[in-house]
Swiss-Prot record:
SUPFAM superfamilies: Scorpion toxin-like. This is Defensin-like protein AX1. Disulfide bonds join C3-C46, C14-C34, C20-C40, C24-C42. Gene3D superfamilies: Knottin, scorpion toxin-like. Strong inhibiting activity against C.beticola and other filamentous fungi. Little or no effect against bacteria. It comes from Beta vulgaris (Sugar beet). The lineage of its organism: Eukaryota, Viridiplantae, Streptophyta, Embryophyta, Tracheophyta. One of its GO terms (biological process) is defense response to bacterium. The keyword Disulfide bond applies.
Length: 46
């Protein structure tokens, strides 16, 4: 299963998954993707 949470560090509209991933990395979450409404969502295995 994959756990998801909104990024606390990401600011602004999410256009590139790589930028989102960097923000999630700071939160010790290995993955991050842009989701609808231009938000950054961090993901990791549960």
């Amino acid at each position: 299963a994959i756990c998801k949470k909104p990024s606390k560090f990401f600011k602004g509209a999410c256009g590139r998954d790589a930028d989102c991933e960097k923000a999630c990395d700071q939160e010790n979450w290995p993955g991050g993707v842009c989701v609808p409404f231009l938000r950054c969502e961090c993901q990791r295995s549960c």
